[in-house]
């Protein structure tokens, strides 16, 4: 069973960087982020329909789902600002270092113990993160504000993951994902629109990328959905 969980988590970790990579490379990362959440919501609804699962079963854990959705809003605000101001290869490992945060919180407050294979997997992730961010003559401490934003993104994502892990003990992963995405997508759209460049048209700023790079938008959403679904299945 633990090997199955490790395989799900590892596959999820391999897929997940595609979302941030495509968002960072897109000339309009806010629009790409919004597109990803629209794709997630659609895929989750289709997945639930195919599986014959009632999306309204979320009422059993509505407070957890609402908190998770608000956490997603905060995560993307912190993460997008981090990727805009800092080097992606340096700060992505920090924003995605939530397994360490989860392990510490679970051990200290939830009394959870982890097996050797899971601890080994976390250690491998952080060894890889070190080599990703390492650059001779340069350090992440050179941008303290960006570093703080990256750490905040990591903490928020860790809290969201803990809430989602609790949620999928009651409902199916696609149900949780659908409502979390639906809760977050509209507030994020409003926030992105209010903070757009002064010379940017709101519709073009938020949705113009669907005309310019529809393939990358679909890739962002689909890869992230599969990644997060596998992670929730592991829980």
Q: Whereabouts are the PLM-identified features?
A:
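Short, charge-rich binding segments
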Residues: 80-85, 92-94, 107-108
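Hydrophobic alpha-helical transmembrane segments in multi-pass integral membrane proteins
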Residues: 43-55, 102-118, 155-171, 220-235
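Membrane-interface interhelical linkers
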Residues: 1-70, 74-86, 134-149, 182-235
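Small-residue-rich transmembrane alpha-helices that serve as helix-helix interface/gating elements
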Residues: 123, 178-185
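Transmembrane alpha-helical cores of Major Facilitator Superfamily
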Residues: 93, 97-100, 151, 182-185
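Hydrophobic transmembrane alpha-helices of multi-pass small-molecule transport proteins
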Residues: 38-44, 104-107, 117-135
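Hydrophobic core positions of alpha-helical segments in small-molecule transporters
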Residues: 11, 35, 67, 94-97, ...
């Amino acid at each position: 069973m633990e090997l199955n969980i490790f395989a799900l988590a590892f596959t999820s970790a391999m897929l997940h960087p595609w979302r941030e990579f495509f968002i960072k490379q897109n000339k309009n990362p806010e629009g790409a982020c919004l597109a990803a959440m629209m794709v997630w919501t659609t895929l989750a609804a289709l997945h639930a329909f195919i599986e014959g699962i009632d999306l309204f079963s979320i009422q059993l854990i509505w407070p957890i789902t609402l908190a998770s959705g608000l956490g997603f809003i905060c995560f993307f605000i912190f993460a997008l600002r981090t990727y805009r101001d800092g080097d992606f290869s340096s700060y992505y490992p920090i924003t995605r270092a939530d397994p360490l945060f989860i392990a510490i919180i679970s051990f200290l407050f939830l009394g959870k113990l982890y097996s050797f294979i899971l601890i080994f997997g976390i250690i491998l992730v952080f060894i890889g993160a070190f080599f990703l961010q390492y650059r001779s003559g340069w350090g992440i401490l050179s941008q303290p504000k960006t570093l703080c934003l990256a750490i905040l993104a990591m903490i928020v994502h860790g809290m969201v993951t803990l809430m989602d892990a609790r949620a999928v003990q009651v409902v199916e992963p696609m149900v949780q994902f659908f409502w979390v995405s639906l809760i977050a997508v509209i507030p994020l759209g409003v926030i992105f629109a209010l903070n757009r460049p002064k010379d940017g048209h709101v519709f073009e700023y938020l949705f113009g990328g669907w005309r310019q790079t529809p393939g990358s938008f679909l890739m962002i959403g689909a890869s992230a959905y599969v990644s997060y679904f596998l992670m929730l299945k592991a829980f």
